[in-house]
């Protein structure tokens, strides 16, 4: 039995599962691998540094930090024939573009702090040869900036059996009902104010009189507040968030054009679609790879106006099964795990 340890550099030390990034990049893969006979555990970089954890075969470091003790342990693993992989789901290592990051642009960190964070992340990256990433643009950027020869495998975020079972439970057992005409926007962090502002006029025009549900930290533009029935709810727990998604007919996911956003995952589509929602989204590469009658892609303001109108007006005419099956077939975690296993086998042949 192969033993796999996922190590995440998350600030959520007590309950890392509720960090969405850790859930997708560590727990979801671990659950699927456990089903296939692997022995998998998830821990934090804090625990990895503090304890002797050297009895695993494969180590996956999610967003690895630059810390002398941490790096020494990683080097020991590499020198002792362990399979060592760095995993990224965000462009946290690109010093050249650090000041274009939402961390800096949202004012959550000073220029000095942002450059320090990105410099340390970049320094950590240079100690790894093998990488898994959530999107193709992320992989391309690692190839571009790496100083040594590297190998990168794209393992997309995908739907898990656990997420599907939550949605199915809401659909069949709890009978959570759609709120007619409700359009939802789900913001995990305060960094999305500008994204929403870019499409505010389109929302106000195409969704006038409809309920707009905003969940999480976001400043709702005045033009939307005047035109729509706005409901705002603070950030909620994971299961409650899924329930709120399931009450929406349409979920929107606007993003401004930037190198950082182009590297983001398209999970907003498949999470919402499997919950029975149509989706209007900016076609970042990881959204653009999906096709569905219930996915409406928009970039310009006029495209957003049209897409919002089409999504809201066509909701009842598109079978719920189309939304669910499209998401299930195109965001299949079993296919992603197969890619991961092939990559690990390739590494194993090289390090043995």
Q: Where in this protein do the model-derived segments appear?
A:
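Nucleotide-sugar-dependent
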Residues: 190-194, 238-239, 243-244, 249, ...
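Conserved catalytic-core segment of nucleotide-activated headgroup transferases in glycan assembly
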Residues: 8-32, 157-226, 231-246
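Membrane-proximal helix-turn-helix segments that form the acceptor-binding/catalytic region
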Residues: 75-76, 108-131
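A charged, aromatic-enriched C-terminal amphipathic alpha-helix characteristic of glycosyltransferases
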Residues: 168-170, 313-348
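Acceptor-binding helix/loop patch of EC 2.4 sugar-transfer enzymes
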Residues: 12, 16-17, 86-118, 162-168, ...
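Donor nucleotide-sugar binding/catalytic pocket of nucleotide-sugar-dependent glycosyltransferases
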Residues: 127-172
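N-terminal pre-catalytic "stem/leader" segment of glycosyltransferase-like enzymes
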Residues: 1-61, 65
